[in-house]
């Protein structure tokens, strides 16, 4: 019985890795991001799975000479792309974000960002399978939110940018292993 369990676990692990590769292929993240003024290589990519359901694939791009962690900590140029693998209701997304942000920040800080956060979250609606969102941060321009290649939101509020990117890149956001994988500089 024990041997059967081990074989099944190994088979599941191999299938999971193969499935992840197929999901990355489907997401088709570029090896580098070029916005016309700079080229940022893809540093990492992950797949978020919740209760055996694949939710999205994500890729992180930063300048070549810094780590993803430095880019986030120092608020340098970075781009986080999300390719959605299933439909999601807007209310489910905002509820999940609110839960994470409450874990990460004080009530007072969240209250100071509430109006800006509400405006950001109202910029997008329900997500459909195949939608591609990007959180693109440039210290000079601020944070752009893109949906399928079109900018749908911009804010020059640097605290809001760090707050929202922190859902994926700060502790207490993503499951820790996924967060570390996203910050790990692996393609």
What are these model-derived regions, one by one?
Residues 65-140:
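Mid-length scaffold segments of soluble, non-membrane domains
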């Amino acid at each position: 019985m024990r041997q059967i369990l081990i074989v099944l676990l190994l088979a599941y692990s191999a299938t999971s890795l193969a499935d992840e590769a197929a999901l990355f292929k489907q997401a088709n993240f570029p090896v580098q991001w070029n916005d016309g003024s700079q080229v940022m290589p893809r540093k990492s990519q992950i797949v978020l799975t919740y209760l055996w359901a694949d939710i999205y694939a994500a890729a992180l791009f930063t300048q070549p000479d810094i780590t993803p962690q430095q880019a986030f900590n120092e608020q340098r140029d970075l781009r986080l792309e999300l390719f959605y693998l299933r439909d999601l209701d807007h209310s489910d997304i905002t509820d999940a974000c609110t839960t994470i942000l409450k874990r990460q920040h004080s009530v007072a800080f969240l209250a100071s960002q509430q109006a800006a956060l509400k405006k950001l979250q109202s910029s997008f609606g329900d997500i459909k399978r195949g939608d591609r969102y990007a959180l693109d941060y440039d210290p000079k321009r601020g944070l752009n939110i893109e949906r399928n290649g079109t900018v749908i939101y911009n804010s020059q509020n640097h605290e809001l940018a760090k707050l929202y990117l922190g859902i994926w890149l700060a502790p207490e956001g993503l499951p820790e292993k996924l967060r570390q994988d996203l910050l790990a500089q692996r393609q």
